[in-house]
Amino acid sequence: MHPTVSIAILNYQRRDVLRGALESARAQRFPVVEILAVDNGSTDDSVGMVRREFPDVRVVALDDNVGAAARNAGVAAAKGEIVVTLDNDVRLTTPDDVERAVAVFARHPRAAVVNFMILGPDGRLSRRDWCHPRDPDLWAEREFLTAYVLEGASACRRDAFLAAGGYWPPFFIGHEGLDLALRLLDRGHDLVYTPAVRVRHLVEPSARPSSRIYYTFTRNAFWVALRNHRPAAALGSLAQDLALMAYCAVRAGHARAFLRGVRDGLGGAPAALATRRPLSPATYRRLRALYGLRPSLFRRVLRHVRERLI
């Protein structure tokens, strides 16, 4: 017997883009129990559009923009045992995508999350969206266990997501998927990447990231380390993350954003430490195995430079 499935689409101020996401969700052959539009306090009539044009879609309307944490409200409101979570600019590419995601969960009974392959507007792998600890040139077409959650292009087991606490609201955006991944792994769950489900991300891959990315990713790297890692591991994780981010920020002309991120990452340390839950030794052993095929820091920097990822 198949599990029940909901589709939850996150939106903020992109009414016309949301329309396309809802249409791709409606086109699924798998009998989903519901489609939810989770709106982050939009003022562009997104909610009105959904209610007029998609009366079968359930609206979860938030008063304010709370960033990625709005997904928590969507998953909590969902009726399905599995919740497909998509951003408004992500499109399911075939009518069988949900059915394929369900099949991946059946193959991996310990999986809490199934991450999808993300394609760019040109239909090729979106290398900017590749967050897994594997070389995309070697692994993009293979299914494997990973150590990351792709927030806007994945499916989760609702109970596991909620039990792990969902996305920590102070992150707003940036590294919240890594933080949740660590907490799910620490609870004994698996995280899977599959090329069986391919979604298209409509963001133009050549678009230059704003300074906000360098700020939030730097700030949030501190909080991920403080919330999850033991001291030695925290220092190691931060050293690599900050080295890569500092280089990319300086190269892009956003050194000040990086420094603000360092300042506010340290300033937010008390709140992060208040929610601290250090990973167990068993989880560190799992992480060493999962990261065993990760390219070196030098290769990752080289890739970012060559492909201008951030």
Model-derived features: positions:
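Non-catalytic, C-terminal membrane-associated alpha-helical segments of glycosyltransferases
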Residues: A233-I310
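Short aromatic/hydrophobic "clamp" motif used to bind/position activated sugar donors
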Residues: V83
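Short, acidic, metal-binding catalytic loop of nucleotide-sugar glycosyltransferases
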Residues: E23-V32
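Conserved donor NDP-sugar-binding/catalytic core segment of glycosyltransferases
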Residues: T94-S126
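Short, flexible, basic/aromatic active-site loop/helix in glycosyltransferases
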Residues: F116, W130-A147
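A conserved acidic beta->alpha catalytic loop
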Residues: S24, D39-V47, R91
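Glycine-rich, basic loop-to-helix element that forms the pyrophosphate-binding segment
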Residues: A61-A78, T94
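A short, conserved alpha-helix in the catalytic core of glycosyltransferases
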Residues: Y148-C156, A160-G165, P170-R198
